[in-house]
Design a protein with these regions (language model features):
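Bacterial N-terminal signal peptides that target proteins for export
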Residues: 1-11
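N-terminal secretory-pathway/extracellular module detecting exported/lumenal segments
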Residues: 22-130
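Bacterial N-terminal signal peptides
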Residues: 10-19
Length: 130
């Protein structure tokens, strides 16, 4: 019983600290510079120009937003946020976070000629090189 009580108290303290931590709130607030890159029958793709960061020689990370147009499965459509890691030399990418949830097992892949992904890769790599 004592172990359960200690666990519950620890969880409450952890949640309270995260909810009421002014430093965390301040660092989470920031301006987003969304640029609509492309719109097609599948949806719309934006990139946050202020989020583009160089990681290694040919690798960058960038925050993107994708709105999937309504279809038979999703009547209202769906918006998702991705943190993409992009290799500008090979034009490969991996989604390292989706809607704030880390994807620890993300694998490098090509766009398979998806024009919305291609435009993100091209614009992001061009921005970091200018």
């Amino acid at each position: 019983m004592k172990k359960i009580s200690k666990f519950i108290i620890s969880v409450i303290i952890f949640i309270s600290f995260n909810l009421f931590n002014p430093i965390q709130k301040a660092s989470a607030i920031g301006e987003v510079d969304w640029l609509l890159l492309k719109e097609n029958n599948d949806g719309k793709e934006w990139v946050d120009l202020g989020s583009i960061r160089k990681i290694k020689d040919n690798e960058i990370s960038v925050l993107t937003k994708y709105f999937q147009n309504p279809n038979k499965e999703k009547v209202k459509g769906e918006t998702n946020l991705y943190v993409m890691r992009i290799n500008c030399e090979t034009k490969e990418y991996k989604d390292i976070s989706v809607n704030g949830i880390p994807s620890f097992k993300a694998q490098w892949k090509t766009s398979n000629d998806d024009e919305l992904i291609d435009v993100v890769i091209d614009k992001s790599c061009n921005e970091i090189n200018t």
